[in-house]
Amino acid sequence: MHTLFISDLHLSPKHPDITASFIQFMREEAIKADALYVLGDLFDFWIGDDDPTTFAEQIKSEFRQLTQQGVPCYFTKGNRDFLVGKRFAQQTGVQLLPDEAVIDLYGQKAVVLHGDTLCTQDTRYLEFRAKVHQPWLQRLFGLLPFALKQKLVRKIQSDIRDDKQHKSMMIMDVTPSEVIAVMHRYNVDLMIHGHTHRPAIHSIQTDDQTLKTRIVLGDWYSQSSILVYSKLTGYSLLSRPLINIE
């Protein structure tokens, strides 16, 4: 018995090797799991649930096949796919989670999240996040023609790339005090997140001498990153080569 966690695949038609590796994962590994958690940034950018492209349908089909075969799939929105909505959930059978969710892993409580909200030193990003998460703005964006939304997103992505070049690695990493604050808020000793693209398993000793664990999922740019949480043996963070597409 085991549960799987992935994040930060940044799926895009531009990266067929990542897409092929994801499809293989869904069909050969996820299908055998008790549940699958996707902790944000599945897509390089999700423009909206009205995406008519073959690529979008291909990805939705993989989730639909998985959930129809009885494997629960839970989805946390990331900073690249925060526009995933109810229509996507209905079409795929996935269950959308709030920004922070407490789950039960075979008797172990854990808080799962994408991880961007832990980076409290990145104030410019958090200001941007607050703006684009406003419901009225998302509704307005959703009313735009798909082609216009694509154009706007390309501009946003370009601005984000330029902004990243001027940020230090420390600013883009999590703030330790925020990690502890979130774990205390939910009274958990285990946190699982993505976003930073720095896969690792961290042990944290708090002021009250409690030992806590923070597991960070990696991206799929050059290899896969999968957290396997087994009922019998606990957790292991795995990576595998991507499928080579000639």
UniProtKB/Swiss-Prot annotation:
UniProt pathway: Glycolipid biosynthesis; lipid IV(A) biosynthesis; lipid IV(A) from (3R)-3-hydroxytetradecanoyl-[acyl-carrier-protein] and UDP-N-acetyl-alpha-D-glucosamine: step 4/6
Superkingdom of source: Bacteria
Residues that coordinate or bind Mn(2+) 1: 8, 10, 41, 197
Entry GO CC: cytoplasm; extrinsic component of plasma membrane
Binding-site list for substrate: 79-80, 122, 164, 167, 195
Residues reported in the UniProt entry to bind Mn(2+) 2: 41, 79, 114, 195
Reactions catalysed, as given in the entry: UDP-2-N,3-O-bis[(3R)-3-hydroxytetradecanoyl]-alpha-D-glucosamine + H2O = 2-N,3-O-bis[(3R)-3-hydroxytetradecanoyl]-alpha-D-glucosaminyl 1-phosphate + UMP + 2 H(+)
UniProtKB keywords: Cell inner membrane, Cell membrane, Hydrolase, Lipid A biosynthesis, Lipid biosynthesis, Lipid metabolism, Manganese, Membrane, Metal-binding
Stored Pfam families: Metallophos
Cofactor note: Binds 2 Mn(2+) ions per subunit in a binuclear metal center.
InterPro entries tied to this protein: Calcineurin-like_PHP_ApaH (IPR004843), LpxH-like (IPR043461), Metallo-depent_PP-like (IPR029052), UDP-diacylglucosamine_Hdrlase (IPR010138)
Enzyme nomenclature, EC number: 3.6.1.54
Function: Hydrolyzes the pyrophosphate bond of UDP-2,3-diacylglucosamine to yield 2,3-diacylglucosamine 1-phosphate (lipid X) and UMP by catalyzing the attack of water at the alpha-P atom. Involved in the biosynthesis of lipid A, a phosphorylated glycolipid that anchors the lipopolysaccharide to the outer membrane of the cell.
Protein name per UniProt: UDP-2,3-diacylglucosamine hydrolase
Organism: Vibrio cholerae serotype O1 (strain ATCC 39541 / Classical Ogawa 395 / O395)
Lineage of the species this protein comes from: Bacteria, Pseudomonadati, Pseudomonadota, Gammaproteobacteria, Vibrionales
